[in-house]
Amino acid sequence: MTYKEIAKKYLENNGITIGDTIKINKEDISYEGILLDRSEDSEDGYLVLKLDSGYNVGVAIENTQAELIQKGDKPKIGYGAEDIAHDPSKQNISIISTGGTVSSIIDYRTGAVHPKFTAADLIKANPELLDYANYNVKALYNILSENMQPKYWVEAAESIANDISDGSDGIVIAHGTDTLHYTAAALSFMLKTPVPIVITGAQRSSDRPSSDANMNLIDSVVAAKSDIAEVSVCMHGSLNDSYTYLHKGTKVRKMHTSRRDTFRSINYEPIAKIENHSVDINPNYRYTKRNENELEVNSAVEEKVGLIKSFPGICEELIEYHIDKGYKGLVIEGTGLGHVPDKLITPLARAHDENIPVVMTSQCLYGRVNMNVYSTGREILNAGVISGRDMTPETAYVKLSWVLGQTNDIGEVAKLMNKNIAGEFNEKSSIKYFLN
């Protein structure tokens, strides 16, 4: 049980454990349902119940009374799972869980959610997977994706490299969707891979009829068996269950809070469409083929990099603060072609003079930075700011973090930021990329 001090004591005092059916009375309202577990990094003082309607509700336990309605059964996840036979005719796929909706299994007898599971558990929840590959499944960590940190990218990259070295024919990463695109970019810079690395997630939990978890996971396995030996993201391509898209790891972004087709290629096209569990590679895309590269890992990152959005009321002190606090690099989300108010030029120049690289991106997301058009842009360039070209702010942030892990020489940083390492920017823009 992952409930913490306050909630844990509350449950113990009332003789309640995960899977029990309980009633929580609070003032003039009550909630009845099955007590669910919570993720390891959830806030203390709350319980989560699965109601008869199928929806989950979080209840603050302050000033409440708990009533045990019925004891629950022991969870069946991970218990008595029969061995899954290895099929030598099939490829070996590693599935690595980092937490998130897609990698959780619901035990309907207890209502418990299990983000840590075995290969047998995964097959029980998604039996169609047996048609595609043999599996090695492990939980790397169990966090909500908003709590992702650069050090976890390093752990993921090294875990992936170990699996590839051990003979895995493809990798699937199960990840929460909120920061999935950051991780996709990070792995793109950290790894040269001889096999596909596919990151997937889910917008709807697997206990909901509208869940996208099963299809995304199966299509990710299909992509991991393909010839595209790159880091990519596999998610729904439409609101229904007709197909998924494969997006380049450095050119993808979450663009909607709740839609199942939230992930879109930015300043790029999807690199493949997966329909009826078959991969149709974009004929315009020149991809790295399986075994074309030897495995290389360069996972060092600098964690103290800032991402700052320009806005009409922004003041010089915001830039000065990051300099004074010892930040090693800054990415600016400028307006339009890559602009900030002219009052920021002096602190930006100070950053450059103190060997703190600054990279300019655009809030527009689509299109590219061009600081040669207007006088303010030219002054920004003269202050030593590096163009982020058509990278998304998130990809530029990840790249700068990675580059600073390789070198702290500001001249070398500029060279690497202007070098296309993982397809993170286009040399030319195309009108077909806008809102594709």
From Swiss-Prot:
Domain Asparaginase/glutaminase: 91-420
Pfam families: Asparaginase (PF00710), Asparaginase_C (PF17763), GatD_N (PF18195)
A GO term, aspect molecular function: asparaginase activity
Signal peptide, first to last residue: none
Family under the similarity heading: Belongs to the asparaginase 1 family. GatD subfamily.
Superkingdom, taxonomy of origin: Archaea
UniProt KW keywords: ATP-binding, Ligase, Nucleotide-binding, Protein biosynthesis
Protein name, as recorded: Glutamyl-tRNA(Gln) amidotransferase subunit D
Annotated EC: 6.3.5.-
Subunit structure, as described in the record: Heterodimer of GatD and GatE.
A GO biological process held by the record: regulation of translational fidelity
InterPro entries, A to Z: AsnA_fam, Asp/glu_Ase-like_sf, Asparaginase/glutaminase-like, Asparaginase/glutaminase_AS2, Asparaginase_C, GatD, GatD_N, GatD_N_sf
